[in-house]
C-alpha cells in the first residue's frame, strides 16, 4: 500500500475530510477509486486497513468525501489516519512524465558515485518542497567511520541519473554529503 495523504479534521456537515497530500498525483483521487484508511504506521499490519470508495475530491480545497462517510461524527473517526492506495491502482491511474518516478520504485535502489556504492535508498522524505533520498550507507563505509544513514536532496547537483532497469541511482557530490553527515 502506498501512502496518498494524511487525513486531517472533518469539514462541514456532510462528512468532508481535509486531506494533506503526500503524493504528487492528486489526479488519482477520482470518484469510484478504492482507497484504504489506517494508522500511518500500519504498513506491516494488513488487518489495520479499512476500505472505502472515493465519492469526490476537491483539489483546490484538499477536501475528500468518501461514499460511506456522511456525517461529521463518522469523519472525525478518521482524523489523523493515513489514506492509502494499492501500488497497482496508483500505477494504473497516474501517468508519469519523462523523468518522473513512483517513490516505491526508488526504494531499494543502490546509490553509486563513480565506481563506489555508497548505499541504498531506504526511504524518501519530503521536507518543504524538496524530496530527499534517505540512504543506508554500505557496511564497508560505516566501518571507515562514516554515517550509517544520510540524506541526498533530489536535485541535479547531486543526482545524475536514475536507472530503474539497473536498480541504481548515479550521483555526484553525494559522497561529500556522506562524509559531512
UniProtKB/Swiss-Prot annotation:
Presence of the UniProt keyword Cytoplasm in the record: yes
Subcellular location(s) of the protein: Cytoplasm
GO molecular function, one term: ribosome binding
Record keywords: Chaperone, Cytoplasm, Ribosome biogenesis, rRNA processing
Gene Ontology BP term (one): ribosomal small subunit biogenesis
Residues of the PRC barrel domain: 98-177
Gene3D superfamilies: PRC-barrel domain (2.30.30.240), RimM (2.40.30.60)
InterPro entries listed in its UniProt record: PRC-brl_dom, PRC_barrel-like_sf, RimM, RimM_N, RimM_N_sf, Transl_B-barrel_sf
Broad class of the protein's primary localization: cytoplasm
Record text about domains: The PRC barrel domain binds ribosomal protein uS19.
Oligomer status and interactors: Binds ribosomal protein uS19.
Role of this protein: An accessory protein needed during the final step in the assembly of 30S ribosomal subunit, possibly for assembly of the head region. Essential for efficient processing of 16S rRNA. May be needed both before and after RbfA during the maturation of 16S rRNA. It has affinity for free ribosomal 30S subunits but not for 70S ribosomes.
Stored HAMAP family: Ribosome_mat_RimM
Family, as annotated: Belongs to the RimM family.
This protein's name: Ribosome maturation factor RimM
Primary gene name: rimM
Amino acid at each position: 500500500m502506498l501512502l496518498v495523504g494524511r487525513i486531517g479534521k472533518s469539514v462541514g456537515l456532510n462528512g468532508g475530510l481535509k486531506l494533506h497530500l503526500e503524493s504528487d498525483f492528486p489526479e488519482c483521487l477520482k470518484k469510484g477509486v478504492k482507497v484504504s484508511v489506517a494508522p500511518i504506521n500500519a504498513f506491516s499490519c494488513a488487518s489495520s486497513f479499512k476500505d472505502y470508495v472515493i465519492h469526490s475530491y476537491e483539489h483546490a480545497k484538499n477536501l475528500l468525501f468518501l461514499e460511506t462517510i456522511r456525517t461529521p461524527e463518522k469523519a472525525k473517526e478518521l482524523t489523523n489516519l493515513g489514506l492509502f492506495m494499492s501500488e497497482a491502482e496508483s500505477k494504473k491511474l497516474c501517468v508519469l512524465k519523462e523523468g518522473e518516478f513512483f517513490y516505491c520504485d526508488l526504494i531499494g535502489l543502490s546509490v553509486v558515485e563513480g565506481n563506489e556504492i555508497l548505499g541504498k535508498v531506504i526511504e524518501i522524505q519530503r521536507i518543504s518542497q524538496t524530496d530527499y533520498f534517505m540512504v543506508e550507507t554500505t557496511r564497508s563505509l560505516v566501518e571507515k567511520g562514516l554515517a550509517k544513514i544520510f540524506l541526498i536532496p533530489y536535485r541535479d547537483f547531486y543526482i545524475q541519473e536514475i536507472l530503474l532497469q539497473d536498480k541504481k541511482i548515479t550521483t555526484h557530490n553525494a559522497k561529500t554529503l556522506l562524509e559531512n553527515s
